[in-house]
Amino acid sequence: MVLERTLSIIKPDAVAKNVIGDIYSRFEKAGLKVVAAKYKQLSRREAEGFYAVHRDRPFFNALVEFMISGPVMIQVLESENAVARHRELLGATNPKDAALGTIRADFAESIEANAAHGSDSVENAAIEVAYFFAATEIILR
């Protein structure tokens, strides 16, 4: 059994709706274990750094503004196939295209305010996890 880790961020829109617990319940029911978590208000610098790969995209500034508009819940999830399992729970980036019962279909407002971020590959997950968490903050379960 090969365990993977993925980074998950519950975005300001979902935090404002008070659905963190609902989302965590879905993670746990799907076999994803929370091995690190922090509730925080991202600074502009943190948001710009995290989304630096999108710096030249037309939506970059709006994305940064949205991500600093309120607190976020950031967690590291662990399981077999964690990246794919988490992305399946999230649903399509655009909630209009997300399957019924997915996090984005149930809690997202728009493609911009789409409730949650999930790493798109094992390689990016490692980079994203390290961006927000020191190795000592990740607790094995």
Curated annotation (Swiss-Prot):
ATP binds at residues 11, 59, 87, 93, 104, 114. GO terms for cellular component: cytoplasm. It comes from the Bacteria. Keywords: ATP-binding, Cytoplasm, Kinase, Magnesium, Metal-binding, Nucleotide metabolism, Nucleotide-binding, Phosphoprotein, Transferase. Transmembrane segments: none annotated. The active site is at 117 (pros-phosphohistidine intermediate). GO terms for biological process: CTP biosynthetic process; GTP biosynthetic process; UTP biosynthetic process. It is an enzyme of class 2 (transferase). Its EC number is 2.7.4.6. It is found in: Cytoplasm. GO terms for molecular function: ATP binding; metal ion binding; nucleoside diphosphate kinase activity. It catalyses: a 2'-deoxyribonucleoside 5'-diphosphate + ATP = a 2'-deoxyribonucleoside 5'-triphosphate + ADP; a ribonucleoside 5'-diphosphate + ATP = a ribonucleoside 5'-triphosphate + ADP. Its cofactor is Mg(2+). Belongs to the NDK family. Major role in the synthesis of nucleoside triphosphates other than ATP. The ATP gamma phosphate is transferred to the NDP beta phosphate via a ping-pong mechanism, using a phosphorylated active-site intermediate. Homotetramer. This is Nucleoside diphosphate kinase. It comes from Xylella fastidiosa (strain 9a5c).
